[in-house]
Regions:
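Hydrophobic structural patches
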Residues: 112-123
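Structural motif
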Residues: 29-31
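A common structural junction motif
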Residues: 77-80, 121
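Alpha-helical membrane-embedding segments
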Residues: 87-90, 124-128
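Proline-centric
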Residues: 2-6, 56-63, 79-80, 90-114, ...
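Non-catalytic DNA-recognition/assembly elements of restriction-modification systems
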Residues: 1-20, 27, 104-107, 125, ...
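A short beta-sheet element
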Residues: 34-76, 85, 91, 95
């Protein structure tokens, strides 16, 4: 497995894309980005479902690791946005120029997905710990001078 062996590919090599259509069911693992009032947010649906029409949907081709696709799109989208956004909206035809850094090896993709999931778990644990400590601080400060209530 060689993690440094990646190449730049066009989004159309790994998935199709379209402006989301109302009431259309999209497959699990599809990624989406905003076209209206666009920001750097990239979403992914975990189960088959509908997506609002203000989004562009990336529908993965057969055999594509959808978790890896989400990571690749998330990492490449801010750079693409800086280059191609001309107003607060993004034009659907410009999305065809979207390029991804892509690892061809399935083993490398699986390794990256596993590593990113572990990092995300650590982030969530740390955020939960911070929240618990904030609540603990609030409790202790609230009870610091009990006679002053």
């Amino acid at each position: 497995m060689n993690l440094k062996k990646n190449k730049v590919i066009n989004i159309t090599e790994v998935c199709g894309f379209e402006r989301a259509i109302d009431k259309k069911k999209y497959p699990a693992g599809s990624c989406y980005i905003k076209l209206s009032a666009v920001d750097e947010f990239v979403g992914q649906i975990k189960e088959e479902g509908e997506i609002d029409s203000r989004y562009c949907v990336f529908i993965p081709k057969e055999g594509i690791n959808t978790d890896y696709l989400f990571i690749a799109v998330s990492r490449s989208f801010p750079k693409f946005l800086c280059r191609y956004r001309t107003t607060i909206n993004l034009q659907i035809d410009v999305v065809s120029k979207f390029e991804l850094d892509w690892h061809e090896e399935k083993e490398a993709q699986s390794y990256i997905v596993k590593a990113m999931k572990q990092i995300q778990r650590e982030i969530e644990l740390t955020e939960a710990q911070i929240e618990r400590e904030k609540n603990q601080k609030k409790y202790y400060l609230g009870n610091l001078f009990p006679d002053m209530k």
